């Protein structure tokens, strides 16, 4: 017998709930939430769409198109949250500051937030934004898992070397609270590992359904 990852079915049936410009517009602060963060063009929306097998998150050629906290329902207790992207140049500074204020309020005060998935473009990892998110997560005691996205853009050997290098840097600077993996949305690389992390944070790790082995 083999175990089916319990989060898989929930992700496949996920639906859009609402968008929030401010924390007081978010759903009730109960249950389990996992948030997805990343600089613009880090592949966040593509990763989220691949994990949910749907076009839930808006993808765009214009960096920073996601301007709101977008909530997606997995079941009555569990949600995924697509956070605004950062690093774009075409957005007015006052609007950036507005997003940053409310993002910080969400990250710092959300009791149902159980973990943070941080997307880094494997070709440009550890940007200033990434370092800020790492500092915040460790200081807040928030579990973080990093997806080194667009791993298909490098050879496997080069991707593996980057993974080991970034992993070593993170352990030295931030300890073992942060985990990391390779990920590619087009190649569907790293899905099972990411699902396992989500299941653990959402307390589904021991609820796998047994399936006949193929």
Swiss-Prot record:
Mg(2+) binds at residues 45, 66. One of its GO terms (biological process) is division septum assembly. Its cofactor is Mg(2+). Residues 30-204 form the EngB-type G domain. It comes from the Bacteria. The keyword GTP-binding applies. GO terms for molecular function: GTP binding; metal ion binding. GTP binds at residues 38-45, 64-68, 82-85, 149-152, 182-185. Gene3D superfamilies: P-loop containing nucleotide triphosphate hydrolases. One of its GO terms (cellular component) is cytosol. Keywords: Cell cycle, Cell division, GTP-binding, Magnesium, Metal-binding, Nucleotide-binding, Septation. The keyword Metal-binding applies. InterPro entries: G_ENGB_dom, GTP-bd, GTP-bd_ribosome_bio_YsxC, P-loop_NTPase. NCBIfam families: GTPase_YsxC. Belongs to the TRAFAC class TrmE-Era-EngA-EngB-Septin-like GTPase superfamily. EngB GTPase family. Necessary for normal cell division and for the maintenance of normal septation. This is Probable GTP-binding protein EngB. It comes from Pseudomonas fluorescens (strain Pf0-1). The gene is engB.
